[in-house]
Amino acid sequence: MEEAELVKGRLQAITDKRKIQEEISQKRLKIEEDKLKHQHLKKKALREKWLLDGISSGKEQEEMKKQNQQDQHQIQVLEQSILRLEKEIQDLEKAELQISTKEEAILKKLKSIERTTEDIIRSVKVEREERAEESIEDIYANIPDLPKSYIPSRLRKEINEEKEDDEQNRKALYAMEIKVEKDLKTGESTVLSSIPLPSDDFKGTGIKVYDDGQKSVYAVSSNHSAAYNGTDGLAPVEVEELLRQASERNSKSPTEYHEPVYANPFYRPTTPQRETVTPGPNFQERIKIKTNGLGIGVNESIHNMGNGLSEERGNNFNHISPIPPVPHPRSVIQQAEEKLHTPQKRLMTPWEESNVMQDKDAPSPKPRLSPRETIFGKSEHQNSSPTCQEDEEDVRYNIVHSLPPDINDTEPVTMIFMGYQQAEDSEEDKKFLTGYDGIIHAELVVIDDEEEEDEGEAEKPSYHPIAPHSQVYQPAKPTPLPRKRSEASPHENTNHKSPHKNSISLKEQEESLGSPVHHSPFDAQTTGDGTEDPSLTALRMRMAKLGKKVI
């Protein structure tokens, strides 16, 4: 109770002291204002006195004197108020001093009466022990046949609590011996070494310099005896700094050398790539085509075959030839492949390559013949250049081994027909053409859909695009209903008519090569070697598809 009253008296003294300080500050401000007014009135009175000496009229002198008297009166009032305020300030300062003295006395009493946390804990223990309660032993004494060694659970719990609360019986979980060197000039402590000790073997020898309930620090001299007298206690900051230095010293370990990470081989699973068939680079160098004496249309076909894809365009027709290039020995080896009529919106696949390109002046596409009309042989033209002849002599191809390495020999090969030449059998050529039995089997494969075919037929015109300007134009005849290809007669005039019906057979072409020139409208369109102009052959094929006949 006494402590509470002292605390209350101290708080009241602090409050009174604060009020007095505020009054003193206000009075000092008032004094400053009065002093400024006093100085202003003094200056005004001196100026009026100086002006009064130069005035000769009586009325003005009387007015100036009255004003001067009023100013002098105000000056006296201000001087008195300033003196009074200064006296009040002195009284307030004395009262503040008395309150401060009283506050200091109360604070001293509080320090003498105030108890620490340890004192409070001890007093609570003493009160618990002094409290009059019935003994537990008396309760269990009435129980018969109870062994003397039996300890009630409540009593055992109290004993355990006393052991835990007792500071002397506390066990250290971790102990460490730290050697510290202290600089007496700067006061800095340096950790020399730190040795962990077993907590069971640790003995609190030395002088306790720090204890916060969780950590205890004992000062021991170098000979493991108590430190010299006059050892001061350590501050929490110093203890934390020592523990930090000790932990850093323990964490330091010798450098372990190992192979760098980048020295180990790195194995990364390869990403499977999609198989795409694209024409290889330098296609014309890899596949050397020996052709001499062919027409302009054939040369354009060879050029376009090396450049990539080309599209034959007619009126409302798109012809796309997916024919991969194939090398051949010394002579032009070709296979004409019949293509289907497809809609205009059909896209070209990446593997498709064309063998011919439509001539700007020609009214029809380049010629394409049946695989049955494919021929192979030796090509030697009389007007061929010396360079081509040297290449023919140096380069000897085998038709089987001249294929690209990525093509299987067992799979069928697509060949392109480029024209006819006279071929002569010789023993020398047969030696180089080992593995070639003289026969190449070719077949015409047509893949179509009946629905697409019907749609395509609906879009096809019944006459050739340039037929009105041609000499062989005839009006279209009404066509019967479409039937299946297997049931249609080869001689019927339908859109499914074979395109090779009106083409020249091998025997007829051989006869035309040896026969004299006939005077026909199309004889002028022949090449220098006697073969038929490819544009005329293409016109024949186109007219054959449309059911017309070229004379």
Swiss-Prot record:
From which organism does this entry originate? Homo sapiens (Human)
Regarding protein family, the annotation reads:
Belongs to the paralemmin family.
In what ranges is there compositional bias, type Basic and acidic residues?
248-259, 484-495
Instruction: List every position bearing Phosphothreonine.
Output: T271
Q: Which residues carry this modification: Phosphoserine?
A: S135, S321, S370, S384, S385, S498, S515, S520
Location (main, coarse): cytoplasm
Any S-S bridges, and between which cysteines? none
User: Can you state the subunit structure given in the record?
Assistant: Interacts with GLUL.
Its recorded name reads Palmdelphin
Q: How is it modified after translation?
A: Phosphorylated.
Q: In which tissues is it expressed?
A: Ubiquitous. Most abundant in cardiac and skeletal muscle.
Coiled coil feature spans: 12-106
Q: Name one GO biological process term.
A: regulation of cell shape
Query: Taxonomic classification, please?
Result: Eukaryota, Metazoa, Chordata, Craniata, Vertebrata
What gene is this protein translated from? PALMD
- Give the N-acetylmethionine positions (modified residues): M1
